[in-house]
Amino acid sequence: SDNRQFVSNPYIQSVRYSGGIPILLPLIRSDTMLEQYLRLCDGFLFCGGNDITPLLFGQEPREGIGNTNITLDLFQIRLMKLILSSAKPVFSICRGMQIFNTACQGTMFQDIRYQPGESLDHMQRSDSRSDVSHPVRIERSSRLFSCLGRSVYVNSFHHQAIDRPGVDLKVSALAPDQTIEAIEHSSHPFAIGVQWHPECMFRSSEKMRRLFRGFITAAQN
């Protein structure tokens, strides 16, 4: 909507109960203000939301694309690039991971039907968003491994997926159907994206709490 901006409460509570102070950053059309955001905050969390505008990763819209907002996309991509040029930590969730990938010149499958091979249903139908849907396998060399171990069961609420990871991004977790479930920046101190929603599993999963605590600790340092 043009007249409101919001963040779902689980993101806010997950930051708060991990020792951080949540600050909501509204969409603005000012590069000067973006630089002030960078100075103001110690770490950045990019949340879930709408699909990414296909033109921003070099494609025209295909069947299955959902709602998009190019103004928000461009704002978040500019902010992401600023953060990655600094040493400040960034944790990106679902759409946030897709923004992370797009900002680094990666590409997307506009709908998971376009991914080669047989895919899982990544839009789970359970009543509770904390319910798990499928396992992910985590790379031992990744930062995620120190928080989550070799594998973890996650929830799943997405229909888009990363096709080609962006420049300097490495894949750190995969689903059983080889969908990319997490990425990390190879040279940034703390830049992680996950496709699932750890904020919805925060109360039920110690591993997800460790993930948020790792982000907040990086911001505090």
Go through each PLM region and give its residues.
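Hydrophobic, aromatic-enriched interface-forming segments
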Residues: 97-100
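Active-site-proximal beta-strand elements of phosphoester/diester hydrolases
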Residues: 192-195
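Conserved G/P- and acidic residue-centered "switch" motifs that form tight phosphate/ATP-binding loops
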Residues: 94
